[in-house]
C-alpha cells in the first residue's frame, strides 16, 4: 500500500506541531494559574533539610568519583552538620501538640493551596486534550499516516489503528487518532529539548499536579539525619581515580 506524500504535510505535521505548541502553551498557563512553582509552597527550612539529606545520599552513591581528600572533606562537613542538626526545621507547637507528634495535614495552610493547584492542573490538562481530540477526530478521521519501520505483534493493532476498520491491514500502519495518543504519551523528550519541565508536561502532571520534594515526616527528620550521618561515618571509600594514570597508559600503549 502506498500513501500520498501530501498526508505528512497536511495531516502528520499539523497534528505534531499543534501538540507541541499546546504543550508549551499549557506549561505557561499552568505557571500563570498556579502562580509559582511547587517548591515555593514549601518553607525554606524544609527545603534546606531535604536538600542536605539528598546531598548525603548523593555523596554515598557517587563518592567513588571523588578523590580521597575531597570525599573526606565533604564527609566531615556533612557528618558534623547532620549530627548537630544545624539545618533541622523546628516544628512549632500549636494547640498543646507535643513535640514529635505528626501534624494534621488539614490544618496546614499549604494543603489547600496544593489541592487547588492540583485541580487547576487537571483542568489545564483535560480541556486542551479534549479540544485537540475533537479536532483530530473531526478533520482527520480515517487517515492512515505512516508505517512504522519495525515489526509489531497483533496486540498493537487496536492501539495503532483506532478509527480504521480493516482487519487485513498490517499492524505497523498508524492512524491519525492513534498518532495523537502516541504524541500525548511520547512528547516529553521534545519538551525537555526546548527547555520545559517534563514533570509538569508529562501525563503524571495532568493527573496529580506538580509536586514539591517529599522528604521524611517532620517527626522522623532528626532520625533520618542521624542515620545518614552514621552511614557516612562507616562507609568505606574506594575512588576510581586511584592509579588512573597507569590504567590509561596500560590501555592505550
From Swiss-Prot:
Membrane topology: Multi-pass membrane protein
BP-aspect Gene Ontology terms: protein folding in endoplasmic reticulum
Regions that span the bilayer: 10-30, 126-146, 176-196
Keyword terms: Endoplasmic reticulum, Membrane, Transmembrane, Transmembrane helix
GO cellular component terms given for this protein: EMC complex
Family in the record: Belongs to the EMC3 family.
Chain's role: The EMC seems to be required for efficient folding of proteins in the endoplasmic reticulum (ER).
Listed name of the protein: ER membrane protein complex subunit 3
Organism: Saccharomyces cerevisiae (strain RM11-1a)
Gene: AIM27
Amino acid at each position: 500500500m502506498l500513501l500520498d506524500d501530501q498526508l505528512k504535510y497536511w495531516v502528520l505535521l499539523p497534528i505534531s506541531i499543534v501538540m507541541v505548541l499546546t504543550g508549551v502553551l499549557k506549561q505557561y498557563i499552568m505557571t500563570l494559574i498556579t502562580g509559582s512553582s511547587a517548591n515555593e509552597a514549601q518553607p525554606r527550612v524544609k527545603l534546606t533539610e531535604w536538600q542536605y539529606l539528598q546531598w548525603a545520599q548523593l555523596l554515598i552513591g557517587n563518592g567513588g568519583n571523588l578523590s580521597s581528600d575531597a570525599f573526606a572533606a565533604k564527609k566531615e562537613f556533612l557528618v558534623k552538620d547532620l549530627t548537630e542538626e544545624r539545618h533541622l526545621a523546628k516544628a512549632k507547637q500549636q494547640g498543646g501538640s507535643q513535640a514529635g507528634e505528626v501534624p494534621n495535614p488539614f490544618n496546614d495552610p499549604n494543603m489547600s493551596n496544593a489541592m487547588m493547584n492540583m485541580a487547576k492542573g487537571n483542568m489545564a490538562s483535560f480541556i486542551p486534550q479534549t479540544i485537540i481530540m475533537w479536532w483530530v477526530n473531526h478533520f482527520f478521521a480515517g487517515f492512515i499516516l505512516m508505517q512504522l519501520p519495525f515489526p509489531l505483534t497483533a496486540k498493537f493493532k487496536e492501539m495503532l489503528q483506532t478509527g480504521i476498520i480493516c482487519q487485513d491491514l498490517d499492524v505497523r500502519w498508524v492512524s491519525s487518532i492513534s498518532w495523537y495518543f502516541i504524541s500525548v504519551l511520547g512528547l516529553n523528550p521534545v519538551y525537555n529539548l526546548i527547555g520545559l519541565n517534563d514533570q509538569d508536561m508529562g501525563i503524571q502532571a495532568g493527573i496529580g499536579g506538580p509536586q514539591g520534594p517529599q522528604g521524611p515526616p517532620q517527626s522522623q527528620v532528626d532520625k533520618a539525619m542521624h542515620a545518614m550521618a552514621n552511614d557516612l561515618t562507616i562507609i568505606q571509600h574506594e575512588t576510581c581515580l586511584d592509579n588512573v594514570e597507569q590504567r590509561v597508559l596500560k590501555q592505550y600503549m
